[in-house]
Curated annotation (Swiss-Prot):
Reactions this protein catalyses: 1-(2-carboxyphenylamino)-1-deoxy-D-ribulose 5-phosphate + H(+) = (1S,2R)-1-C-(indol-3-yl)glycerol 3-phosphate + CO2 + H2O
GO MF, one example: phosphoribosylanthranilate isomerase activity
Enzyme Commission designation: 4.1.1.48
Source species, domain of life: Bacteria
SUPFAM superfamilies reported for this sequence: Ribulose-phoshate binding barrel
Pathway(s) served: Amino-acid biosynthesis; L-tryptophan biosynthesis; L-tryptophan from chorismate: step 4/5
BP GO terms, sorted: L-tryptophan biosynthetic process
Protein name: Indole-3-glycerol phosphate synthase
């Protein structure tokens, strides 16, 4: 595991401990279980695939540890509206505060501004965060295989599914993919960014794609998609679902950038 990932996960453990003291799990769990406003995240991507068009999970991200501030003029609601108006299937919103300058309030604002299903993009290390995700309105959570053992992967997936949420299981190599395929979720993300070196290679998705397809799962390529040629390369290989953030966040109109990239 990389130093940066270890650092982030250690921070998350501290944050959850503080959050549990501030608000007991029982209270949070009640809020999560009583929300009835779930939006079909996996279904939105499946409908795009059935229609023969790319299913884009458009990301709302202010900053990252590797790039610093990506979008100084950061208005989550306006960005969400722009994405929704230009063909995004779903949204991804960073809620990590320390490393990505995200916030739960950003997810709430983005979701309130449109009708798209929303992924909570964060580093989950505790069941508390799964209930927290649904309580804040998330329709999908991210489980990073590199960050979790098999028991927690299974537990967090089960809780999410009981709450009606979809689960995007993120992998980077064959060993992680093998572990991801033990779960029930149809959504398999392939992060083209190596979390150990932060280098990006689209070959990562292409190398894992045959196994994902053979298992009847949906491959979602993440990171490094920045040009129409990248999109063409992926689609010709059979990838129909994309998670893209930075390429849009650096443009004045993120939605217009989405429409151009996937024209």
């Amino acid at each position: 595991m990389s130093d940066i990932l270890e650092k982030i996960l250690a921070t998350k453990t501290e944050e959850v401990a503080a959050a549990r003291k501030a608000r007991p799990l029982a209270s949070l769990r009640n809020d999560a279980e009583t929300r009835r406003d779930i939006r079909d995240f996996a279904g939105a991507l499946t409908r795009c695939q059935s229609a023969g068009r790319a299913g884009v999970i458009a990301e709302i991200k202010k900053a990252s540890p590797s790039k610093g501030i990506i979008r100084p003029d950061f208005q989550p609601a306006a960005i969400a509206e722009s994405y929704a108006g230009h063909g995004a299937a779903c949204l991804s919103v960073l809620t990590d505060v320390r490393y990505f300058q995200g916030a739960a309030d950003y997810l709430v604002a983005a979701r309130d501004a449109c009708d798209l299903p929303v992924l909570r993009k964060d580093f989950l290390v505790d069941e508390y965060q799964v209930f927290e995700a649904r309580a804040m309105g998330a329709d999908c959570i991210l489980l990073i295989v590199a960050a979790l053992d098999n028991a927690r992967l299974a537990d967090f997936e089960a809780i999410a599914r009981e709450l009606g949420m979809a689960v995007l299981v993120e992998t980077h190599d064959a060993a992680e993919l093998d572990r991801a395929l033990r779960l029930a979720s149809p959504l398999i993300g392939v992060n083209n960014r190596n979390l150990r070196t932060f280098d990006v290679s689209l070959d990562t998705t292409l190398s894992l794609l045959p196994v994902i397809q053979a298992e009847g799962r949906m491959a979602i390529t993440e990171s490094g998609i920045s040009t129409p040629d990248d999109v063409i390369r992926m689609r010709e290989a059979g990838v129909n679902s994309f998670l893209v953030g930075e390429a849009f966040m650096r443009e004045a109109d993120p939605g217009a950038a989405l429409a151009h990239l996937f024209a």
